[in-house]
Amino acid sequence: MAAAPPIEPAVTTTFPGFKFSPTDIELISYYLKRKMDGLERSVEIIPEVEIYNFEPWDLPDKSIVKSDSEWFFFCARGKKYPHGSQNRRATKIGYWKATGKERNVKSGSEVIGTKRTLVFHIGRAPKGGRTEWLMHEYCMIGVSLDALVICRLRRNTEFQGSTIQKPPQPSLPLDKHVNLRNEAISESIYGWETMVDFYLSSESGQELLSEIAESSQSSQNPQVPSEEDFYADILRDEIVKLDDPAVSGNTLINVPRLQTESNTTRVLPLPDMVDKQMQSLLQKLPLQNDTGEENNISMSNCFIGIYSIKSINRARWDVVVWLLVMIAVLVFYLV
């Protein structure tokens, strides 16, 4: 009597109530171990497929056991580089990205293998878009990196937008669609930098930068006495009174010092126009004056010179205030 032909795995799936749902321990200790030992007929219900040569939505059709939730495959882990340690996980339009840590699978107290979870992303790392396709990769302990593994493919039905099983074919508009979210984030982050760069590249921005650099350099470098400081010291120090007759040698008079609101004295360099005014003022002073009328004229000329210096200081304060306003506007745009 001839022996009955073996029942094909595809035939057994047609019976109602049949469901192929092995546990993690069964996948490693029975199916994967028997496959690596060469016992092909006892594990032929799980086909061997090069998973990374296909997209995840094409793999369910290659499964022997038909299902709507999970599918199982044997797959050899290929290396990304011939002499490297990374596994090849890229497909034509996407890649499988490992999430979380590699977990141990125990049978009792003995570790028999490892389990790793991967998620499929469309695009290229690191800007790929996550999909609803998940995969658990089971590997035995003590085998090489390119050894055979079992892959449990699943589709997360609760994932947003998972009603579309197959995304459209990749093209230039698809790549732009994948990067829309990243472009929106980068636009909000770098928008103010573009505005500041545009302002600083203009003529007014360059002038502002040069003024800030000059002010910082002048605050760091000490003032070197110059010819302009010499006339400022003349107004601050005591001046020989040349208008009065010499009674007991040269008589000195006190000239009011230029002081700021904080009663501190600063050496401010005077422009060339003030130098010319001081020189002309000193030339007009007579050596001796016997009349009180000419004395009053000389003193009035001195006060005119002092008033001119105060006007110069006021103009310098206007420049400082303008510079502070420009810095405040720049900080406002930066914030």
Swiss-Prot record:
UniProt-listed PROSITE patterns: NAC
Domain NAC, residue spans: 14-156
Pfam families, A to Z: NAM (PF02365)
Transmembrane portions of the chain: 315-335
Positions of the DNA-binding region: 112-162
Membrane topology: Single-pass membrane protein
InterPro entries in the record: NAC-dom, NAC_dom_sf
Keywords: Activator, DNA-binding, Membrane, Nucleus, Stress response, Transcription, Transcription regulation, Transmembrane, Transmembrane helix
PANTHER family from the UniProt entry: NAC DOMAIN-CONTAINING PROTEIN 86-LIKE, PROTEIN CUP-SHAPED COTYLEDON 2-RELATED
Protein name as it appears in the record: NAC domain-containing protein 60
Organism of origin: Arabidopsis thaliana
Biological classification of the source: Eukaryota, Viridiplantae, Streptophyta, Embryophyta, Tracheophyta
Name of the coding gene: NAC60
